[in-house]
């Protein structure tokens, strides 16, 4: 299949990778590279030097790990460090939405942030609204003087003004507002956009849906308390960061609240629409779009959701002991229910109301202090505030009185008391028995609210159900208010003008040869406004960790297929670097918490827990001994000098990533390779179609080279090609793993054969193809089995799957028994896959029945048979089976070769398979089509599914009859 990639769209949305600028254009400055190639999010590297907790680092990676290359160095303590790190990333996230060469306005931002990165196109409106703003300008002047004295590259004046955004006359089509809207509000931002001629604005604010409901709350990730104070136009909201002495923030509630409650605003003939995009890390990203196009009137609706608010009941209690002012207190629904259930049974009307309230208060104290599970108090409940406890007990007592009175009235109303009473209750009151004892005055008061008789004990509502969502609806601006419009023809004129302008700019760039210049090596650091200059750093410069050799020149592809392949190869380089950095970061964290320093480790006991979970975690002592008996060989280790090879007299720590630490070498080698131009043909065959046999038949000695995804596949192919000399130098040279080929190089070949190509990253395959200088790639695999998976949940793969130019499909299997055909067809139907090649697959196997299943209660019911291969979906089940296998007469080599996860087993072919699930807890892999397909198609003769308990959505259970 030919590639059909839109080049302009690709550059705008994905782009190339400016992290390896030397690989694209040698000796080009980063700014020229960004302007010529792309201005994509993933081309930015952000160094965060703040010390973030594990939870904060995970949240930061989850929010921006796919958009930027994050380097968390954990160097400095800083006030509200996560908020500062997020603020830096938010700048680039918002700026990357706009054309890279157009001017941009920053409302309320820091001019230093853009000046230090040489981003001359951004104009900052930095008004002095108080002494804090004035002090910030002085601090920025200090930083500017420092950078001017340390570097000769800065000769531009910062692009900013001291005007309010509404009063500035600088014009631009785009704008950002990073936490600058608190004092402007939605309509204030619209006024600023109107004065600047801005069409699209993107910004961020701290967000908590409970602000619409409560008077105070807490943003857990930012560790920020907020509190609403005052009322009406004077109401403010205060933000205080927990356990920090930095200045707090106070803003008008009407301004901040407008981002939650309003959606549209009109100024003259322009309509401004607010859209809330994303809520992550307690920060909401939004955009405001201006339009002059004619549009019909519509109702705009949005909802603000409160997390877990439905678990509570609102209890009305008097505020400051006033009969006229009441406030709502949230009490856990389970607490209120249990208090009412117990107190209702013990309630006695003959007692004084204070005695009944004491009983309610006693039950309330017990139920709000503990949570009972299975008859035992095993966890603390949600204690009430000391100021609210007595009033909540009072309100619940009066609520019980109300219910008894209403039940009494209901029973009395059900008795026959004549036609007059019947007419009054059924027709006049509409069957509402609650009015029986309130009298005519209360009835009239309910119809005329001005009488204000709804705060008495017999009519007040003490309990209210809380909704977990606040709904807002607003009409778009009426047509009568729009005085000027662009017509549809005007819109098309704008489109044509943009295209012509782009063509003109391209022509000028082609006519002008950019001068050669060295990429600056300085790193410039930025900090949040309220922290020290060292606290946060973010670099936009290309990564200089991998510098190509001077003689290596990487050509920049210009065709759509080349651009796609270039992006895949750069993604593979970034992925390898990410995994290497993760390994180093994990080991650094372990070294720090264990008190490692020099040749001493202060707290060796911490390794006991880690070693019990993973026996590859160990400590090498300076005397040459190991803290635990050495079972594995390690190539590198970690200490205060970093990750790398160590000497016998050094103290260092290791884990499983130290056994074969080659990711950095793979990344460096891959970064030097140009994009290959060879064609890629895919042989897409069903499971057991004889792909290894096909490789053997297609292989031509002296012309072809074979590459596999892993060592086991390479050994199988060598055994098939060279059964007698599979360990010879010839066999080892022509059949290689992809990692080995990249690290050590490969001989040139005419054709590259790839086994289990789906397990390789697309960029990894392209790197091997480029190194081999082949003219054709013949890839063998199954596009419906397990594909390449990222080992970093925060790294989003855009080019992981293989892209081919031609595809040949094979429908015949020689391995799978006949009943597997039906089981896989059922699997595909349950997954809704109607276009699968397995819909028409056939089998040459003589085995008609092979699938069975058996219920077990523990791993002790699994008998280890040396003639079977045991598969699991999870590493935990695999470890449990390996422990179980030690009770049987099998060797360690047998355990390593015959107990695998399904992912590890892809590509193998054995006679008998047992798939084991030892837990009934949630496991999404049993719902994944590709994993279940691999599990069902590894055997030739028999397959047994041993499962412990029912698991919702278990495809294996449903497909094995």
UniProtKB/Swiss-Prot annotation:
Residues 682-946 are annotated as: ATP-dependent helicase. Residues 811-961 form the (+)RNA virus helicase C-terminal domain. Residues 71-260 form the Alphavirus-like MT domain. Keywords: ATP-binding, Helicase, Host endoplasmic reticulum, Host membrane, Hydrolase, Membrane, Methyltransferase, Nucleotide-binding, Transferase. Its EC number is 3.6.4.-, 2.1.1.-. Transmembrane segments: none annotated. InterPro entries: (+)RNA_virus_helicase_core_dom, Alphavirus-like_MT_dom, CMV_1a_C, P-loop_NTPase. The keyword Protein biosynthesis does not apply. It is found in: Host endoplasmic reticulum membrane. Residues 503-541 are annotated as: Disordered. Belongs to the bromoviridae replication protein 1a family. Interacts with RNA-directed RNA polymerase 2a. Involved in the virus replication. Contains a helicase domain and a methyltransferase domain. The methyltransferase domain is probably involved in viral RNA capping. Involved in the formation of ER membrane spherular invaginations in which RNA replication complexes form. This is Replication protein 1a.
């Amino acid at each position: 299949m030919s590639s059909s990639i839109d080049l302009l769209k690709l550059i705008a949305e994905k782009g190339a990778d400016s992290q390896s600028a030397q690989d694209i254009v040698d000796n080009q400055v980063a700014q020229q590279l960004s302007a010529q190639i792309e201005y994509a999010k993933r081309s930015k590297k952000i160094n965060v030097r703040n010390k973030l907790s594990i939870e904060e680092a995970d949240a930061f990676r989850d929010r921006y790990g796919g958009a930027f290359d994050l380097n968390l160095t954990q160097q400095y303590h800083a006030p509200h460090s996560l908020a500062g790190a997020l603020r830096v990333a938010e700048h680039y996230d918002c700026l990357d939405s706009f054309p890279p060469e157009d001017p941009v306005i920053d409302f309320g931002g820091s001019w230093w942030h853009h000046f230090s990165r040489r981003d001359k196109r951004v104009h900052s409106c930095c008004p002095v609204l108080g002494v804090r703003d004035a002090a910030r300008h002085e601090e920025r002047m200090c930083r500017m003087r420092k950078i001017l004295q340390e570097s000769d590259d800065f000769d531009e004046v910062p692009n900013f003004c001291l005007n309010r955004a509404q009063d500035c006359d600088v014009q631009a089509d785009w704008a950002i507002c990073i936490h600058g809207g608190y004092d402007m509000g939605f309509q204030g931002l619209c006024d600023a956009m109107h004065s600047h001629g801005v069409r699209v604005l993107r910004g961020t604010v701290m967000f908590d849906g409970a602000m619409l409901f409560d008077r105070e709350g807490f943003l857990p990730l930012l560790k920020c308390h907020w509190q609403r104070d005052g009322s009406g136009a004077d109401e403010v909201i205060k933000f205080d960061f927990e356990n920090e002495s930095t200045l707090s923030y106070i803003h008008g509630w009407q301004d901040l609240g407008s981002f939650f409650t309003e959606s549209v605003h009109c100024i003259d003939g322009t309509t401004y629409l607010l859209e809330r995009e994303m809520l992550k890390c307690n920060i909401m990203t939004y955009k405001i779009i201006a339009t002059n196009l004619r549009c019909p009137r519509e109702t705009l609706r949005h909802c603000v959701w409160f997390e877990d608010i439905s678990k509570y009941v609102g209890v009305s209690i008097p505020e400051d002991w006033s009969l006229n002012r009441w406030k709502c207190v949230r009490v856990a629904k389970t607490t209120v229910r249990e208090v009412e259930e117990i107190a209702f049974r013990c309630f006695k009307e003959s007692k004084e109301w204070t005695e009944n309230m004491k009983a309610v208060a006693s039950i309330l104290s017990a139920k709000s202090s503990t949570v009972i599970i299975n008859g035992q108090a095993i966890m603390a409940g949600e204690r009430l505030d000391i100021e609210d406890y007595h009033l909540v007990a009072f309100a619940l007592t009066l609520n019980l009185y109300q219910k008894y009175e209403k039940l009494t009235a209901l029973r009395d109303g059900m008795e026959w008391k004549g036609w007059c009473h019947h007419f009054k209750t059924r027709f006049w009151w509409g069957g509402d028995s609650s009015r029986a004892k309130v009298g005519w005055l209360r009835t009239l008061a309910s119809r005329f609210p001005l009488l204000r008789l709804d705060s008495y004990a017999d009519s007040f509502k003490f309990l209210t159900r809380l909704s977990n969502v606040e709904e807002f609806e607003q009409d778009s601006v009426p047509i009568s208010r729009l005085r000027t419009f662009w017509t549809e023809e005007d819109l098309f004129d704008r489109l044509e003008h943009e295209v012509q302008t782009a063509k003109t700019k391209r022509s000028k760039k082609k006519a002008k040869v950019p001068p050669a210049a060295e990429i600056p090596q300085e790193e410039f650091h930025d900090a949040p406004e309220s922290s020290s200059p060292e606290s946060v750093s973010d670099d936009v410069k290309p990564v200089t960790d991998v510098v190509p050799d001077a003689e290596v020149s990487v050509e920049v592809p210009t065709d759509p297929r080349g651009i796609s392949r270039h992006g895949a190869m750069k993604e593979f380089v970034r992925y390898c670097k990410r995994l290497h950095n993760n390994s180093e970061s994990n080991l650094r964290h372990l070294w720090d918490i264990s008190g490692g320093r020099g040749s001493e480790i202060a707290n060796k006991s911490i390794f006991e827990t880690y070693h019990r979970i993973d026996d590859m975690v160990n400590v090498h002592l300076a005397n040459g001994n190991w803290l635990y008996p050495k079972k594995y060989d390690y190539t590198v280790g970690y200490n205060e000098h970093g990750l790398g090879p160590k000497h016998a007299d050094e103290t260092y720590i290791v884990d499983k990533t130290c056994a074969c630490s080659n990711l950095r070498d793979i990344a460096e080698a891959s970064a030097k390779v140009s994009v290959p131009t060879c064609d890629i043909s895919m042989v897409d065959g069903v499971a057991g179609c004889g792909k290894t046999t096909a490789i053997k038949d297609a292989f031509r000695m002296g012309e072809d080279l074979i590459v596999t995804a892993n060592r086991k596949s390479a050994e199988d192919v060598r055994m098939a090609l060279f059964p007698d000399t599979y360990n010879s130098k010839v066999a080892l040279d022509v059949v290689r793993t992809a990692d080995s080929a990249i690290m050590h190089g490969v001989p040139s070949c005419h054709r590259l054969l790839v086994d289990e190509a789906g397990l390789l990253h697309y960029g990894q395959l392209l790197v091997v193809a480029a190194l081999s200088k082949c003219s054709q790639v013949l890839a063998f695999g199954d596009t419906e089995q397990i594909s390449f998976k990222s080992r970093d949940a925060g790294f989003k793969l855009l080019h992981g799957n293989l892209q081919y130019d031609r595809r040949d499909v094979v429908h015949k299997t020689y391995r799978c028994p006949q009943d597997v055909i039906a089981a896989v067809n059922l699997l595909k139907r349950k997954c809704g896959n109607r276009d699968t090649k397995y819909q028409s697959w056939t089998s040459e196997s003589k085995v008609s029945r092979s699938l069975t299943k058996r219920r077990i209660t523990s791993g002790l019911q699994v008998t280890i048979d040396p003639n079977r291969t045991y598969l699991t979906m999870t590493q935990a089940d695999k470890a449990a089976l390996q422990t179980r296998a030690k009770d049987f007469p099998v060797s360690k080599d047998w355990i390593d070769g015959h107990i695998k996860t399904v992912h590890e087993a892809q590509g193998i072919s054995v006679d008998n398979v047992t798939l084991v699930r030892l837990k009934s807890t949630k496991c999404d892999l049993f719902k994944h089509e590709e994993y279940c397909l691999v599990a069902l198609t590894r055997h030739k003769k028999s397959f047994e599914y041993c499962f412990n308990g029912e698991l919702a959505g278990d495809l294996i259970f449903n497909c094995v009859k």
